[in-house]
Curated annotation (Swiss-Prot):
ATP binds at residues 84-85, 140-142, 146, 172. Its EC number is 2.7.7.108. This is Probable protein adenylyltransferase Fic. It catalyses: L-tyrosyl-[protein] + ATP = O-(5'-adenylyl)-L-tyrosyl-[protein] + diphosphate; L-threonyl-[protein] + ATP = 3-O-(5'-adenylyl)-L-threonyl-[protein] + diphosphate. It comes from the Bacteria.
Length: 200
C-alpha cells in the first residue's frame, strides 16, 4: 500500500504484489486503501471512550475494532520490521517490551491528568512521538494511535482535533520527532489541543 516497508519477503503481502492480504479479497492497492478508509471510518464512530487506565492492550483493542473487517491480524503486534522515509520503526521483537515500558511511564505520570495546557502539550508530544516510533502494527498504527490520544486528552479535560493539520507538515514533524526534535510536534499540538467542552 506504500513504499514504507522493509525489503524481503513480507508475509503480510500477497505474493508478487505490494498489496496486503485482506479479508475482502482485494488485490489492488488503491481499492484496498479506499475500502480501509471507508470501513475504519464507520468502525471509529463505534469506539467508546474507554477507561482512564490504559496500556498496550487498549491500543491493540482500538486497532482490532478499526480493522477487524479487513485484516485477520487486526489488533496483533507486527512481526516484521518496517520503515518510512528515513525513519526506521522499533524492531518488531522489542515492541511489546518497549510498549509496556512506555505505558508504565504514562501511568506513573497519571495519564497526564491535571496538567496545565503547556505542560500537557509537552508531555503529549513526547508520548505521541515515542509510540509513533514504536509503530506497533503492520498497517493502521497511525489511526489507532490518534484515537488513543484523543481519548487520553478527553480524560485529561482536553480536546484534540486533527483538522487543519497539513499532511506534509505532520509527516515532517513526526520525522523530526523520531530524530529527537519535538519542537514541530509541540507547535502542532499547541494549536490542536484545547479545553474540552462538557458535551465532549
Amino acid at each position: 500500500m506504500s513504499d514504507k516497508f522493509g525489503e524481503g519477503r513480507d508475509p503480510y503481502l500477497y505474493p508478487g504484489l505490494n498489496v496486503m492480504r485482506n479479508r475482502l479479497g482485494i488485490h489492488q492497492a488503491q481499492r484496498l486503501a479506499q475500502a480501509a478508509y471507508e470501513m475504519t471510518a464507520l468502525r471509529a464512530a463505534t469506539i467508546e471512550l474507554g477507561p482512564l487506565v490504559r496500556g498496550l492492550p487498549h491500543l491493540c483493542a482500538i486497532h482490532r475494532q478499526l480493522y477487524q473487517d479487513i485484516f485477520d491480524w487486526a489488533g496483533q503486534l507486527r512481526e516484521v520490521d518496517i520503515y518510512q522515509g528515513d525513519t526506521r520503526f522499533c524492531h518488531f521483537a522489542y515492541i511489546e517490551k518497549e510498549g509496556n515500558a512506555l505505558m508504565q511511564d504514562l501511568e506513573e505520570e497519571g495519564y497526564l491528568v491535571g496538567l496545565a495546557h503547556e505542560k500537557f502539550v509537552e508531555r503529549l508530544a513526547h508520548y505521541y512521538c515515542e509510540i509513533n516510533v514504536l509503530h506497533p502494527f503492520r498497517f493502521g498504527s497511525g489511526l489507532a494511535q490518534r484515537i488513543f490520544f484523543e481519548q487520553l486528552a478527553l480524560h485529561a479535560g482536553y480536546a484534540l482535533s486533527w483538522q487543519g493539520i497539513a499532511v506534509e507538515t505532520w509527516k515532517q514533524a513526526n520525522q523530526s520527532g523520531a530524530m529527537g526534535d519535538l519542537s514541530a510536534l509541540r507547535a502542532i499540538f499547541q494549536k490542536a489541543i484545547s479545553e474540552a467542552r462538557e458535551t465532549e
